Amino acid sequence: MSEFRTPIKPKKLLDAGETITIPPSPFLNRLGYGTGVSVMQLVRSPRAGQIRSPWALKMLNKRVKPNRVYTDRLKVEAELLQRMSHPNIVGFRAFSKSKILYLGMEACDLSLGDMIERKIEDDCEPFSSKQILKVAIDIGKALDYLHTKMQILHGDMKSYNILVNGDFVICKLCDFGVTLPLDENGVFDKENAGQALYFGTEAWSAPEVIHGGTITNKTDIWPLGLTLWEMMALMPPHSRADDTLDESVTSVEDDSMEEDYFNEKYGTRPDVPANILPDLYSSALTLFYCCTETIPSARPSAQHLAEAAEHFMSILT
């Protein structure tokens, strides 16, 4: 699988947004984390009697050795968010390159990945068909904006990069640190990519990523399909729910077998769990199957996906 090398250098990035005072980490609520970064919630003090909404601050993780790759990713993401405006993409609030490098963003309630984890911990039922369709609608619209208006590939679609407000009132796409440029045909624009290559997360990666095929805008559609599957299966793609191996007695041979298992599964369509009844989830299953076609051209565009999901939603409501 291709590895991320050097992010595309931002054209120009200045400190933007209002100046804020960041309290020590113990006074910040951790919202999440990623490779080399932490996302914290900043509760802003009222100003002139007005209540101000909280922010999400993405900062370099202090426990990780300083790395220019992580710094450059954060700068690339800030520059990109400053240029984007879409209701289904997390909003830019501020960026600072002073003593503490941070990106201030609109705060949302939870990531979809966290919501899935909570359902697993509480032994809950899968998400409803309407909730799955809402994710397909909102994130389909966000990807359509990225692919057509901005001409970029998200590059790391997965449940943890989808933010949800309330009971699926609105879903927003986040984490734009490893985007790639697309040409007018929706194909990875290598000439304008510098040294950047597809990054992604293996479990969600499309077949063309795993097997070295052509990267296009349809490469974002596959992992979105797997995200819809996650909402039904309540587990990450290709994980082994029936794995009862005792970790205390694992061996080199066990590790090798585990690696072989995942190498065989990555880039394939996972089976639908037996408890997902076709009558209740027919529309969600239709979208899942369309998004996870092995041949990229057979997958819907982000626009067509959102339109199909809206049609199915109108039938359910």
Give the role of each language-model region.
Residues 91-101:
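Short beta-strand micro-motifs within the conserved protein kinase catalytic domain, predominantly
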